[in-house]
Amino acid sequence: MDRSIAKMLSNQQIRNFSRGVGHLRRRAAKNNVIKVRPEELRPFFNQYSVLPNGIQNDADAKLFSKELQPGERKLLFDALRKITADQYNDHKKVVEVTIDHEDLVKVWYINFIPMFVYGCLDEAFLIIGGESINNIFSVYNGMSMLASAAVANIICNLFLQLPADRINDVLGFKKPVLSVDQMNIPEYQYAAFGAKLSGLWMGLTLGMLPLFFIDDNLDNRASDNGDLLVSVANTNGDEYCELFCGD
């Protein structure tokens, strides 16, 4: 009886009957009214198909996907992805996303520490490296102090990126587990930006400590002393000539 009913119904009628769950629908055939359960009229899942109860586990999903052609799989994947995105957007509109205070503190530290270490080492190596490069290369090619600082800055930026990024793992700081929505809210953005800005500013300020141990006026004093000795020698020479040679 069920097989004859399925043959009598068209695909569109089957789709119409399959809309709705848990109640009986009626189909008029000539003068008789036949009661049909919607579960028995599902186009792809019925008692005559391989999956009579629908897709209930991974094995059923794999079996169903194997029966599809590559083009059909792509169309089905796009449709499922669109439905999932629509459901996600609807859920996003309803649920208010927040971050706990402890997670915000962790976000602050994991952004503050790398920038602080990077700023401190970069500034210190820039000062020390610029001084060393200037002392080495200025003798041979006349490199200026600004050019030496630029070369030192390039070297520091190339070799300090990786250690600064891994400093959190070395110190044992773990990133908080946050969703994409939580990482897109303003609280997360403000905490991360403020931590990076503060860390870089404090690191660069602390990195200027080598300036207290570098004598920048050494060359100027040596030049001034040399000029002083030359002028004294010239003065003494003139007085010696006046004394013994006369006018």
From Swiss-Prot:
Subcellular localization(s) per the UniProt record: Membrane
Signal peptide, first to last residue: none
PANTHER family: TRANSMEMBRANE PROTEIN 65
Protein name per Swiss-Prot or TrEMBL: Uncharacterized protein C03B8.3
Alphabetically ordered keywords of this record: Membrane, Transmembrane, Transmembrane helix
Entries under InterPro entries matching the protein: TMEM65
GO CC terms of this entry: membrane; mitochondrion
Topology of the protein relative to the lipid bilayer: Multi-pass membrane protein
TM segment ranges: 108-128, 136-156, 194-214
KW Transmembrane (keyword) present: yes
Pfam family, any one: TMEM65
Superkingdom of the source species: Eukaryota
Keyword check for Thylakoid: no
